[in-house]
Amino acid sequence: MHISWLGQTCVKLQTKNLDEDVNILIDGYRPKTGDFPRSFSPQLALYSKGMENAATLSQNPFVIDSLGEFEIKNVMVYAVPGSEENIIYKISAEGLTIVHLGRMKKAPENGDLEKILGPDILLIPVGDGQNYLEPKAAAALANALEPRIIIPIAHKCDTDPDAKPITSFIAELGLKPEATEKKLIIKKKDLPQEETKLIVLEKEY
């Protein structure tokens, strides 16, 4: 599986199931300057908080923007409620479980945490308390969910200059990040077994 961060809460997943490539785009958006790249044509487009300001995508992807359980091209997608009308996505593909917390501002209640506990990979917004989780709250939630890999999203970048820098979250989490990568390429066998890894992705495009 390939995982890339495209700024804000937007993430691109490239996976293969039964010899078929499946491209997934989460929270594609229209930046204030420039255009969202159209070279990526997803089969699935997921939105955590509605489609306002959604990017224009080529082809006609299957869109998920409501709660429920979906199976598309042998990829399982569970859309579960978060706080303040935010949707949390739990995605199962290639034997991996990925949880994307969406545009979360407030951590879910303990009962809701059980639905997303123990993912292989956690994509968590860490940028601020206005649009996303505060770094301190994000670190506490990441620890509570016990993922094997943590990938912070929605921190400061050229399309989100008002968000807090990634350094604030790293300091709160207390984990030394792996070297910054342009994308994460991972298989089930590559997951850490005894520790949690923090991986910081460069914004793509």
State each model region's role.
Residues L13, A45, V77, R103, ...:
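Divalent metal-coordination and catalytic microenvironments
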Residues A55-V99:
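Portal/gating segments that form or line small-molecule/metal binding sites
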Residues I3-T9, E84, L145, I149-Y205:
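Binuclear metal-ion centers of metallo-dependent hydrolases, dominated by the metallo-beta-lactamase
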Residues S83-L145:
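Active-site-proximal loop/helix segments of hydrolase catalytic cores
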Residues K12, P31-D35, G50-T56, K106-P108, ...:
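Active-site environment of divalent metal-dependent phosphoester hydrolases
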Residues G28-R30, G50, G82, L101-K105, ...:
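Active-site metal-binding loops of divalent metal-dependent hydrolases
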Residues M1-T33, E85-G102, I121:
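Conserved beta-strand hairpin/beta-sheet module of binuclear metal-dependent hydrolase folds
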Residues L25, Y29-E69, E114-L123, G127:
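Active-site metal-binding motif and surrounding structural segment of the metallo-beta-lactamase
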